[in-house]
Curated annotation (Swiss-Prot):
InterPro entries: DUF2129. Belongs to the UPF0298 family. Keywords: Cytoplasm. This is UPF0298 protein LCA_1075.
């Protein structure tokens, strides 16, 4: 029996009040709650994300719902580190 990884999607739910945070648990895993900015970060299955977003938008205590952009970002930073090292080397050479 092999354990399969399910794809997850992060959803940011902006609220009018934080009283309903417990109610959001039925839609997904509440990962983080910001009391100051009044938002909740949820994780849901990627295949269920569009349906969950539509259900969340219909709730009266939800201000807005946005998807996390992290899956769309390129997480390879090796080339950027090399570029930064080259820039610092050229700046050091110019100072001398």
């Amino acid at each position: 029996m092999a354990l399969e990884m399910t794809q997850r999607q992060g959803i940011v739910v902006w609220l009018y009040s934080l009283r309903q945070v417990k109610q959001l648990r039925r839609y997904g895993l509440v990962y983080y709650t910001s009391k100051r900015m009044k938002y909740v970060y949820l994780y849901v299955d990627a295949d269920q994300a569009p349906a969950v977003i539509e259900r969340l938008k219909k709730l009266h205590y939800v201000k807005r719902v946005t998807r996390s952009q992290r899956p769309m970002l390129d997480m390879e930073f090796g080339a950027l580190a090399e570029l930064a090292n080259q820039e610092t080397a050229t700046k050091a050479a110019l100072k001398e």
